[in-house]
Amino acid sequence: MQPLVEALAGEYQQRHPNFALDITAGGSLVGIQAVQEGQVDIGMASRALKAGEQEAGMQLFTIAYDALVIITHPSNPIKAVSLEELQAIYSGEITNWSALGGLDLAIEVVARELSSGTRGAFDEIVLGNATLKPEATVVATAGEVETNISKHAGAIGYVGFGNLPPTVTVVAIDGVSPTPESILNDSYRLKRPLSLLVGPLSRTQAHDFIAFANSQAGQSLISQGGWVAIKPAQ
């Protein structure tokens, strides 16, 4: 979410020159905990609050939608899988692309680290009660996912819709490709909210920044940046 919030902060600071916003990325878990402890005014989260995180005074505001986009090496002929097949790949039940009608090539699974909101959303939507295969390559950033995919013909990974690199193949899920339209109408099933979080110790201007993010100007910036705005353009 960092590039999204940086774009919003740049425009907000032009309108409010005395406003200073320091942005640090560390995953949704870090952001949520920092707001809970009063270390920051605003947290970034790309997943819903868990039961233990829903403390009194914590408020989550969705400002955009994103999709988890499944990507593979450009040489991979498989262009679509089902959600069930994707779960089987990441749990280790399916280990070779030939099982899906592809090349006789071992599948190399790439996942994000546990503190990542992207990982949390993927585990919830795709893995469910299954567990990630122990042999998976776990990386910290979307850029590292792309690097691994580009170097390994059998690799599969996931990135956010707003972080989609041009050098990979996008894999459709249940026959539906990720587009702004399919994300908004829920036909693309790997969807997640991008939200800002405030707590009882957050200062007033934190709420004003969130109001800007959900304004027409803020939503326009979100669309221009490649994410899916929650409010259609007027």
Describe every region a protein language model picked out.
Residues 1-234:
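Exported/periplasmic ABC-transporter solute-binding proteins
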